[in-house]
Curated annotation (Swiss-Prot):
Pfam families to which the protein is assigned, alphabetical: Mito_carr (PF00153)
Name the UniProt record assigns to this protein: ADP,ATP carrier protein
Top-rank lineage group of the source organism: Eukaryota
Intrachain S-S bonds: none
Chain ranges passing through the membrane: 13-40, 81-105, 114-134, 184-205, 219-239, 279-299
The organism's taxonomic lineage, starting at the top: Eukaryota, Fungi, Dikarya, Ascomycota, Pezizomycotina
One term of GO molecular function: ATP:ADP antiporter activity
């Protein structure tokens, strides 16, 4: 077999991995301010309970104003480093496990039928997601804690953590390794729910809407993909809220006993709508990330003749 042509002087898979990382870093860094606002709004009740926030945010705009006023504009990128670093081990693990899980659960839609294919897709996605999460979950935990580490008005403007390493050090000291994995269960459930809804909705709607001239229309496909992504994201958002609220209790005296206990307490004390706090910012983040990535893809095509795709999430 002929040797594959090198890209940027490197083997193709190495170039894809590294340049994909640059794409991910650009996308995540561009959307980081919206991501931090989303996390602050989403987890504000845990911050109030821990005495790290004096009053609730009155929506996304109020959170943005107060955060920039109290901490400065650059604080909007707090926690972004951990989020960017997380891309590389996640992608490496995806390369390692992707083929293995595809062989285990790889049904073909036209041969085995839609439902077998869908079940295999959910099983492989859930298994691959859970396996990757085992290795990178602590980085997502650290990112969440740093992003929600607002300068406490009640505690003289002090932060709880002094950077990424400090999050690990303090969490392990107070809660052990288990503290870094709080909320792991709902995270895996969220992957399965999201994938199930995404593929289920996309496969159901595409043959109905994308017909005739729209069948191979890029904008129509992009719009449908974005709508389905948004719908799946909103539907699985409560699981994201539950896992992050559980993360926020590491190092605190009172913790949720389980994901069910967390959901029950949140709904009982704050109402169902609390499970969707920050969902609006999450949609904006998706738009910002996709927009920047589209522009960056075009630049890569101009410079290198191809676009290198970065990971999401």
């Amino acid at each position: 077999m002929a040797e594959q042509q090198k890209v940027l002087g490197m083997p193709p898979f190495v170039a894809d991995f590294l340049m994909g990382g640059v794409s991910a870093a650009v996308s995540k860094t561009a959307a980081a301010p919206i991501e931090r606002i989303k996390l602050l709004v989403q987890n504000q009740d845990e911050m109030i309970r821990a005495g790290r926030l004096d009053r609730r945010y009155n929506g996304i705009i109020d959170c943005f104003k107060r955060t920039t006023a109290d901490e400065g504009v650059m604080a909007l990128w707090r926690g972004n480093t951990a989020n960017v670093i997380r891309y590389f081990p996640t992608q490496a693990l995806n390369f390692a496990f992707r083929d293995k899980f595809k062989k285990m659960f790889g049904y073909k839609k036209d041969v085995d039928g839609y439902w077998k294919w869908m079940a295999g897709n959910l099983a492989s996605g859930g298994a691959a997601g859970a396996t990757s999460l085992l290795f990178v979950y602590s980085l997502d935990y650290a990112r969440t804690r740093l992003a929600n580490d607002a300068k406490s008005a009640k505690k003289g403007g002090e932060r709880q953590f002094n950077g990424l390493v400090d999050v690990y050090r303090k969490t392990i000291a107070s809660d052990g390794i288990a503290g870094l994995y709080r909320g792991f269960g709902p995270s895996v459930a969220g992957i399965v729910v999201y994938r199930g809804l995404y593929f289920g909705l996309y496969d159901s709607i595409k043959p109905v809407l994308l017909v005739g001239d729209l069948k191979n229309n890029f904008l129509a496909s992009f719009a449908l993909g974005w709508c389905v992504t948004t719908a799946a994201g909103i539907a699985s958002y409560p699981l994201d809220t539950i896992r992050r609220r559980m993360m926020m209790t590491s190092g605190e005296a009172v913790k949720y006993k389980s994901s069910f206990d967390a959901a029950s307490q949140i709904v009982a004390k704050e109402g169902v709508k609390s499970l969707f706090k920050g969902a609006g910012a999450n949609i904006l983040r998706g738009v910002a990330g996709a927009g920047v990535l589209s522009i960056y893809d075009q630049l890569q095509v101009l410079l290198f003749g191809k676009a290198f795709k970065g990971g999401s999430g």
